[in-house]
């Protein structure tokens, strides 16, 4: 997969200065909220610093934020996670080990 540069180039998400659009959305929202709450222009500098942190997060895997949002949409929203013992609801008992399978 890493050797096929055309495939990687065609499937790479859109970025702004090395940060994916999902990461930029988080950065802009957090910086804007902090700026509105504090009315301090140094929060814009904090947003620039946060941009470099997000750039390091997505440096090696550009799908980090997509994985995070997929986790939040599936397992993160489960209100009865302890009852079912998993990320999706199923009426069937979850078999965790091979010994439980043989019962």
From Swiss-Prot:
The keyword Iron-sulfur does not apply. Coiled coil: none annotated. InterPro entries: T4SS_VirB3/TrbD/AvhB (IPR007792). GO terms for cellular component: cell outer membrane. It is found in: Cell outer membrane. Its main location: membrane. Keywords: Cell outer membrane, Membrane, Transmembrane, Transmembrane helix, Transport, Virulence. The chain crosses the membrane at residues 33-53. Belongs to the virB3 family. Component of the type IV secretion system VirB/VirD4 which could be a major virulence determinant for subversion of human endothelial cell (HEC) function. VirB3 may play a role in stabilization of pilus structure. This is Type IV secretion system protein virB3. It comes from Bartonella quintana (strain Toulouse).
């Amino acid at each position: 997969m890493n050797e096929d540069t055309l495939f990687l180039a065609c499937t790479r998400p859109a970025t702004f200065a090395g940060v994916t659009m999902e990461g930029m959305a988080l950065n802009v929202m957090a910086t804007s909220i902090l700026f509105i709450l504090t009315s301090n222009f140094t929060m814009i500098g904090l947003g620039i610093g946060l941009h470099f942190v997000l750039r390091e997060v997505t440096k090696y895997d550009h799908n980090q934020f997509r994985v995070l949002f997929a986790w939040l949409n599936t397992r993160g929203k489960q209100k009865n996670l302890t009852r079912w013992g998993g990320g999706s609801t199923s009426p069937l008992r979850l078999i965790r080990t091979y010994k439980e399978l043989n019962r």
